[in-house]
Each structure stands twice: as structure tokens, then as C-alpha cells.
Amino acid sequence: MSSSDARDFLRILAPAMAQAAAIAAALEGRVPNVRKPGAETEVKAALTIADTAAQEALLIPLAIAFRDARLEAEEDTSSVALFTGRDARRRIVIDPIDGTLHFYLGGLGPYAVMAGLAEDARYEGALVALPREGFLFQARRGEGARRRRLPAGRFETASVGHGGAGLLLSDGVPDAVAERLRARGFEVGRGCGGAVAIAPLLPGVRGGMRVAKSDTISTRGRIGLLIAAEAGARIETGNGEPFPTAIDAPADTLVVASDAEIARELRAALAP
């Protein structure tokens, strides 16, 4: 993949991400959950018209420039068929609303709109929008991270923050871990996996943690890690090992932190 591929991916998708985020925000609280048949869990089964509309807003602009890429889309919408998958080295991963059940419908915390472009199983370009918080983040490998306010702010450099006491945990992190962190003086909230991946870039938030509900954190759940890494975040497993950059490599825990001290606090709470 040439560097221009990731550049084109971001250029094409940035306005589409803003549109998808606007769709999700406009329909929030107005759409019912229509369970997908055959799904293994209630979380995987959750589906709204906002999911399908937001996904189409993302796929249609990509269908010409990236038609031959292998597409991994969360929903089975009509534009999925436009992608041939001939170039298996290039993978586009889309999640139009990450956290549909608990975070979009349930309001437990931030939900996200996400898209990533990978070559040889490593993300080269990534975008994550948080509609409720009003931010769009993007990054290209080796060129830093940027963010802008939704719907139409100007992009600026994004970096990790070192103020505040906020932490964002996925719903897979046990309540006991959250309570240990609160006892240490942190302000603990819950968020979808996409939001946790970029947690240290959010105002007042120092870090985030995920514990996979299945064997490993999904490829979708890793999209934001490129953005976090380019912004200077510390990214580890719950054991303190470097989190793998290969998007298919097994890893069932994730710690994302603004600095080494916050990473230690998160790891200690996970394994007291």
C-alpha cells in the first residue's frame, strides 16, 4: 500500500464520518432495537436503522477508490456487495455504531463510529467519531493524530492529555476493577471499545481499559489504537506487554494510558 492510499482513505472518509455521526446523533433515542437473527449474544444481535444508514454513508464514498479491498463491515447492507475483495492485503474495517446495545440505545457511555484501513493486517489509516461528545479523530501511520469538533470544525493536532482523573472502561471490565480504581481517586466511566481505544485523547480522561468478552479483542476494537499511538498514548496488554500491532494477533486485555503511571494504576486494578 502506498502512503497515498491511507491519505485518500482519510480524505474520502472524513466528511462521510461526519455525516454518519450526524445520522447516528439525529436518530438517537428515536429508533428501536431490531434483533439480528442468528446472533450469539444480545450485544451482537443489536441493530437499529441508524446502524445501517450510518454504514451506507461510509461505504458509498469508498466504493470507487477502494472497490478491490477486502471489506469487513459490521452490518449486511446493500453497498457491501460493491467491494470485490480481490486485493486481500488491503482490508477496510467498518463499525457504523460501536456499542449499539449498551451505549447507543442504553446510554451507558460514549458510542463510536469507526473505520480503519489495514495493509498486511496492520492499520495504516483510522478514523473514530464520538457523536455524543462531538469529536472526530483520525490518524495516518507515522504522521500523528488529528481531531476536530463535529459537525464542521477545523482539524488540529491531537495529543494525550495529562489533566483530570477520568478513566474509561469497557463493559467487559469487572465492576470490582472499577471500584478499586474509584478507591484510588479516579473518576470511572464506561464506554464502547472504540471510545476506550482513544480514551486518553478525551478531555479530562487519563486512560482506558478493555477486557474482551470473547477470546480476543476484535479487529474493530483496535481501529482507534492507531490514533492513540500516533497521539503519544501508552498502549499495553493487561500484563504490561506491548499490545500487538497486527490486528488479528490474540490479545484479551487492553490498557491505553496517557503515561506510565496511569498504565500501572490500570494494570494493578486489573490484577490486584
Residues covered by each model-derived region:
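DPxDG-like acidic metal-binding loop motif
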Residues: 83-146
